[in-house]
């Protein structure tokens, strides 16, 4: 009896941690849309600018795919759960929006899948799903979490757009190019990502990137948390 109770509690904990359905993971129908769109951003954001612009900032875990909205460029909706909050009052479970869907996605920006951990800078949005939030600056401010073997957590700026803005404004020198990191560390990050998202893990190799005009950068969690703490103090 005790073993059965323990098994039940463990299963319940896993469902809570992943925000994925207890009836089975619901993933998007495709990761890459039928058409490839080219993004034209009105502006880019440094980490500090995105933090100040956002209603809420948090490390979140993507859960089940909920659906899509067509009309113009598609939007996809997911369940998501807060792992750690840095700004604002984001509900523990909420709806995360992503630009892209089955009809089309941006180049080198696949749809999320259950288990992705993201550091996101969010604004409240109007949608048919409850507690919906979308990223400030679309994909340009989405940072993917990955852990090295020694426990160091890194955040991957896959397109380097936030990092480029850091260099323009001189806000900080928080980031470093992925290409300059030790090869062993990059392999460790790729292996960690492969646990939940093999497609994302492949993108860590610059030779496998379809869009070679962008260079990935990485931040350490410690560096970003120090920045966020200073911004919260005002």
Residue ranges and their predicted role:
Residues 16-19:
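C-terminal motif of bacterial Sec signal peptides marking the signal peptidase cleavage site
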Residues 22-53, 177:
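N-terminal, intrinsically disordered, polar/charged segments of Gram-positive cell-envelope systems
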Residues 68-81:
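Short aromatic-glycine-enriched beta-strand elements
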